[in-house]
């Protein structure tokens, strides 16, 4: 999307950048395949507390518009020195989404394997390891005695942690490590399961649509401790 910066400011405490994209019949890069006029606005706010991100879609068409949000977020590993083996990732996953040979959901959910159960408890090494490309439902995990919705990467040797916190609109995850031999892994929060508009059961897939003039927003936080 060719976003344009619509607002930017800097203070002693934070930096904010707002960017927007409008899709309509006169700007048909997306409209020709998705014939709904809409506005997408993303706000980034950076401070000593971390990075906050908010994305909002507004339906500017005359019909209900399907809307699903997902972010392809790479987390650098290692990020604070050490070796890949020092780091584990935890993610608030519930069940595993069964995928077909095209990596599309079959509609079935599976219990977490022994490998992926480590995402909930203890952590899983996700770089310098085997390929991972898997989908999951969202279910909160316990972090420091509190329920947590999101992903985190921890250096087990130093205790340094990076948190990627999501809101309650995130209902699914895709986790991808690009073959396992690169210095990053992507915990990708999604408001609906991959291919949700074509799912047999839209309700459990997270599919949603918004009426003309309505908006749909999601918020995320990225910070270190």
Feature names for model-found ranges:
Residues 6-17, 45-50, 83, 156-157, ...:
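A short, structured loop/turn motif at beta-sheet edges
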Residues 55-61, 177-178, 224:
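Asparagine-centered strand-capping/turn motif at beta-strand->loop junctions
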Residues 68-76:
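Histidine-centered catalytic micro-motifs
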Residues 154-194:
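Glycine-rich active-site loops that engage anionic ligands at enzyme catalytic sites
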Residues 55, 208-224:
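Short Pro-Gly-centered flexible turn/kink motifs
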Residues 1-48:
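Extended, loop-rich substrate-binding clefts of extracytoplasmic carbohydrate-active enzymes
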Residues 77, 81-167:
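Active-site/ligand-binding surface loops and adjacent short beta/alpha elements
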Residues 186-187, 192-209:
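A conserved acidic, glycine/proline-rich C-terminal tail/linker
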